[in-house]
């Protein structure tokens, strides 16, 4: 891959209704700035009109040392490509981040794994200057061995290989 954002391949024939439900983030590539640390779980829904919405939670540290569970909300605007959305997101509390990011589904089998990608800022050379990505699993225990290779190949294709950190699930957000 030449790492041009405009050349990144996304999921073909993406089926939003099969994508709904709960996904556990098992790895993430961070953007610049405040971000969810771990215990990240996302829930996607599609309403009667076909609109996609999502909620997510995860552990954050704000004000340098205050640890809390952040609840986030997002609405998805369709684009001509069914696997590419514009996501407007905000937090349940005013001090959490708000924004408008691309939300691309790079690949998924709907039942086990999904690879998400978002480039916030494209560099002058067409590569991604600031972006983030989640590797999602339907299982809190992580990816199945047979999905690992596919995911590694896709990380390479989106030029984020070696930039991911594991996302732990300790139940932090369940208790709060």
Swiss-Prot record:
**Annotated positions of the N-acetylserine modification:** 1
Please provide one cellular component term from the Gene Ontology annotations of this protein.
yolk
- Disulfide cross-links: 3-159, 69-173, 119-128
Where is substrate bound in this sequence? 97
Claim: Disulfide bond is one of the keywords in the record: yes
- Keywords annotated in UniProt: Acetylation, Disulfide bond, Retinol-binding, Secreted, Transport
Write down the PROSITE patterns for this protein, in alphabetical order: LIPOCALIN
One Gene Ontology term of the molecular function aspect: retinol binding
Name its cellular compartments. Answer: Secreted
Q: Does the keyword Acyltransferase apply?
A: no
Reading the lineage from the top rank, the first entry is Eukaryota
Q: What does this gene product do?
A: RBP delivers retinol from the liver stores to the peripheral tissues. In plasma, the RBP-retinol complex interacts with transthyretin, this prevents its loss by filtration through the kidney glomeruli.
Family, according to the entry, reads as follows: Belongs to the calycin superfamily. Lipocalin family.
The protein's name is Retinol-binding protein 4-A
The species this protein belongs to is: Oncorhynchus mykiss (Rainbow trout)
